[in-house]
UniProtKB/Swiss-Prot annotation:
Superkingdom of origin organism: Bacteria
Pfam families referenced in this protein's UniProt entry, alphabetically: GCV_H
Chain ranges of the Lipoyl-binding domain: 23-105
Species the sequence originates in: Streptomyces avermitilis (strain ATCC 31267 / DSM 46492 / JCM 5070 / NBRC 14893 / NCIMB 12804 / NRRL 8165 / MA-4680)
BP GO terms, sorted: glycine decarboxylation via glycine cleavage system
Reported cofactor(s): (R)-lipoate
Function of the molecule: The glycine cleavage system catalyzes the degradation of glycine. The H protein shuttles the methylamine group of glycine from the P protein to the T protein.
Protein name: Glycine cleavage system H protein
Oligomeric and partner information: The glycine cleavage system is composed of four proteins: P, T, L and H.
Cofactor note: Binds 1 lipoyl cofactor covalently.
Family membership noted in the UniProt record: Belongs to the GcvH family.
InterPro entries: 2-oxoA_DH_lipoyl-BS, Biotin_lipoyl, GCV_H, GCV_H/Fam206, GCV_H_sub, Single_hybrid_motif
One GO CC term, this protein: cytosol
Amino acid sequence: MSNPQQLRYSKEHEWLSGAEDGVSTVGITEHAANALGDVVYVQLPEVGDTVTAGETCGELESTKSVSDLYSPVTGEVVEANQDVVDDPSLVNSAPFEGGWLFKVRVAEEPKDLLSADEYTEFSGS
């Protein structure tokens, strides 16, 4: 399992892309997707919602459990991935590509996000 170097990671197992025009993409890591098992339902924040770093903003339901989705940053949701709502298996099959969850206009990024190497060491993945 490989964690893309260009992303940053939270200890809640979300990833964050670099901000493009102040907007970053958020998803869950392959480690989290594997731990969840087959994802069957995704609830995402809605466009216009304000999300806060470290707080819940949705949930992922798998055949094993229901897990909260945490935002790695504070900001306004500008897009939710309807493809992943329609086909939750994308979270498992492509967590770093088509399985992204939402895009957020970042107002504040916490200082404790991890690099790919730090996340790999933290998660053991």
